Amino acid sequence: MNWLTNVVRPKIRNILRRETPENLWIKCPDSGQLVFYKDVEANQFVIPGSNYHMRMGASARLKSMFDNETWFDVALPEVTPDPLKFRDERRYADRIKDARARTGMNDAVKVGFGKLEGMGVVIAVQDFDFMGGSLGMAAGEAIVRGLELAVEKKSPFIVFAASGGARMQEGILSLMQMPRTTVAVQMLREARLPYIVVQTNPTTGGVTASYAMLGDVHIAEPGALIGFAGARVIEQTIREKLPEGFQRAEYLLDHGMVDMVVHRHDLRPTLARLCRLLTKAPAVEHAKPAPQLPPPAKPAETAEAPAVATSA
């Protein structure tokens, strides 16, 4: 003990270390900027400074689309969880179990039915956090069930695609979901109901070879990666350097592969407007402000009449 400790007594520090949440801050992949997670979440997972569109979970996506943030979760058919008893470095069944615990979802696709600016719509969302949004038996069943429900309800069907492709652990059973979903889309088309695809980052592989490229209208989020094979694979195959921005949403818009690139904040009114146009529904009449009444007239000031002199 020295003279300093005699003057300033050491304080007892907290033995338990204060835990800091891992996702308290987010680093923007585009600018490298550190952003508070709550700010990004409140901004629909768009980085405020750089406008970079982060990946958005299925529940958050549905919440941002439906009126009053309410909808009905559509019950999806049960499938065999591990039909091939697949195993690589880990068992496929264990990977599914971990993905379910991490995301709270049964599989990569979530389907909801609700109101979009007063119009009934069915929306299916792929969650990339669930095994890369890969298309397996359960995801295929979810898409087909969503399309069937849209026909039953006579409502538009909207899908938010986000996937790395078919799920390799399910083999040919996964690839079979491509023609199955294609047939289901044709069923919706025969019912003359709108089918709108929103391609988010990334939309690749077997998904782009099936239902993600069959929409009546294709919308892409800014900067989304959209394509079948990866750019590196294409370059190695054709032995040529690909142009700048190849397979990005803006490049595909310039070359006619998508109809529009829409900021996430503008998606909801854009989708509602498209659904009304394609179903020939009347436009929503927004409540007009009450006409302002003119201010009441001020009462006229009464002046005393001047006295008139009379002669005697």
Curated annotation (Swiss-Prot):
Highest taxon listed in the record's lineage: Bacteria
Bias-annotated ranges (Low complexity): 299-312
Keywords: ATP-binding, Cytoplasm, Fatty acid biosynthesis, Fatty acid metabolism, Lipid biosynthesis, Lipid metabolism, Nucleotide-binding, Transferase
Gene3D superfamilies referenced in this protein's UniProt entry, alphabetically: 2-enoyl-CoA Hydratase, Chain A, domain 1
GO molecular function, one term: carboxyl- or carbamoyltransferase activity
Principal subcellular localisation of the protein: cytoplasm
Domain CoA carboxyltransferase N-terminal as annotated: residue spans: 24-293
Entry GO CC: acetate CoA-transferase complex
Cellular localization per UniProt: Cytoplasm
Coiled coil: none
Region called Disordered, residue ranges: 286-312
Matches recorded under InterPro entries: AcCoA_carboxyl_beta, Acetyl_CoA_COase_Trfase_b_su, ClpP/crotonase-like_dom_sf, COA_CT_N
Classification via Pfam families: Carboxyl_trans (PF01039)
One biological process term in Gene Ontology: malonyl-CoA biosynthetic process
Job description of the protein: Component of the acetyl coenzyme A carboxylase (ACC) complex. Biotin carboxylase (BC) catalyzes the carboxylation of biotin on its carrier protein (BCCP) and then the CO(2) group is transferred by the transcarboxylase to acetyl-CoA to form malonyl-CoA.
Subunit structure: Acetyl-CoA carboxylase is a heterohexamer composed of biotin carboxyl carrier protein (AccB), biotin carboxylase (AccC) and two subunits each of ACCase subunit alpha (AccA) and ACCase subunit beta (AccD).
Protein name: Acetyl-coenzyme A carboxylase carboxyl transferase subunit beta
Protein species of origin: Bradyrhizobium sp. (strain ORS 278)
